[in-house]
Amino acid sequence: MAKKSLIYREKKRQKLEQKYHLIRRSSKKEISLIPSLSEKWKIHGKLQSPPRNSAPTRLHRRCFSTGRPRANYRDFGLSGHILREMVQACLLPGATRSSW
């Protein structure tokens, strides 16, 4: 299980990302529409003004049950070893083990 402080930090980043999403998107759109380089640099400065944790690349998907940030399957929201355990226990409908 991940530390609660890490899970809380991730939730805080998600809130920040949602808060500054429109500002980032509008600034990027302005940069693509303006031809002059000097104005692009000014808008780029505005793009750097939001907090660093509000960037979408700072977010991690975490396992629903353990909070593990790596080896997550998007379809299930689970990490690999938890997914394997649940499939073996027949807790995920429609998921089967491969055999050939």
From Swiss-Prot:
InterPro entries: Ribosomal_uS14 (IPR001209), Ribosomal_uS14_bac/plastid (IPR023036), Ribosomal_uS14_CS (IPR018271). GO terms for biological process: translation. It is found in: Plastid, Chloroplast. Keywords: Chloroplast, Plastid, Ribonucleoprotein, Ribosomal protein, RNA-binding, rRNA-binding. It comes from the Eukaryota. The keyword Aminoacyl-tRNA synthetase does not apply. Part of the 30S ribosomal subunit. This is Small ribosomal subunit protein uS14c. It comes from Draba nemorosa (Woodland whitlowgrass).
